[in-house]
Amino acid sequence: MCTYTTDNTRTTTTGTQPHTQHAPREVFPTLDTLTHLAREQTYTIAPIACELDSHFTTPLDVLRMLQTVSHHVYLLESARQAHARGRYSFLGFNPKLTIFCENETLHIGDVELPARNPTEAIRQLLRKYKSPHLPNMPSFTGGLVGYIAFEYLRYKEPTLTAALGATNAAAPGTTAPGTTATANPPIQQTPARDLDLMLFDKVIAFDNKTHKLILIVNIKLNHVEEHYRKGVFELNELVHLLNTPAPLRNEEGHVTSPITAAFTKQEFCNTVRRVQTHIQNGDIFQLVLSNQMSARFTGSLLGTYRELRRINPSPYMFYFCGTDIEVAGASPETLVELKEGVLHTYPLAGTRPRGTTPQEDDARAAELLADKKECAEHNMLVDLGRNDLGRISTFGSVVVEKFHAIEKFSHVMHIGSTVRGHIQHGFDALDAIAAVMPAGTLSGAPKIRACELIGTFEKVKRGIYGGALGYIDFTGNMDMCIGIRLIYKKAGRVFVHTGAGIVADSIPEHEFNECIHKAKSSFAALGYTGEVE
């Protein structure tokens, strides 16, 4: 049972409490602390929490329990436990509100609005949930969790409406001067929404260091004592839920057809050459061309996520189950992070497969750093990152903290850099996402023209691929990864999407093979050993 403290007095909550197997747990911060905070009238809500000794072995065990009581769940974690973000895995269920954008309509709960400016509508919603940074709390205490699709870009860039809108038909003027390149006909539309977020005011944080759980409930700061008592009661309900034996459920899924690609090898190579014509004519410098692969699938992606954790541990591991979509992923790359006013983005570009021995691994890393084409591509994307952060950062604050480091993952290695800035007064997490998305590593340069051509040349919409996935905290902090190395399921099909950066001297066959190689960890997690058709 959780108890709360006022000044020096600990008081057991009133009302009937659920039975638990644990001794009373102290709730923090105290009611006295939040009473003082409420008087400041700066914030509308605040988190309260209690710590719970856990019988769960992994965050996945907690997730399995939550799925017995809610279809809508998420798990955000990091396989890099040495990093600060890796200490906690975050879970949630039963969202307070769902927000999604589909068919040019924004849905906020039961309210439908024309999707003219979805970002501003979400900003207005978040103003109702303004929370302080409190000591001894994890980095995420509640907020929005979900994804923003690549095509969401058209809401802030009206010039892209034709290219990224309802179809992939070519917009007027999207071929380079002197060329006859035409758009590839769309073969099927990616079923992901333009935006799919869930608002959670309760969070379960799994401490990977101590294997304890931190249970978090956000309470309103008006009538603070009443809401504090209610919050403590809700914490006790969480304790009871987590101590209730969960029935076993089948979490395995199976690919039931060959995986087919939107582009055949010949089509992809021909499209690379058409992109290179635009580069040679000075229309763009680089473009990331992608290929979508899909298959029929039965069952859940939870088992697939478990395999991804094992074979492709990454800085951003995520499982997300929304109204009509299930997503599992292991992204290596941050889109943008905002923590207490400091912005970071981490461009990754340039790829080699991992070696089979330490010596071969080192040799491939040296080869990658010596590759002028790969380094030139990476430098271009670092410059894009600096420019993106510069639009919302204080003058002179944008710096490259780390340059041309080798970042190694389970199957591949990349060249990585770190760009930092300090966000200007008047800008927020939503502005930061808008400034950086889509990442140059998933679009090209110049970014807007590259995106226009992507809409022209690619056969299907990208959806989550190349978009953003993560959280925006009630405190204003935010951490979003790039939507890559992911698998999602909808309407009985799974989708895997990978891309390659095309520059003037790219070899088309090599770029096609890079797309297939990047998909290998996803295929392995799905248990698929066949060829791509």
Give residue spans per PLM region:
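Extended alpha-helical targeting/anchoring segments
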Residues: 2-8, 14-174, 178-533
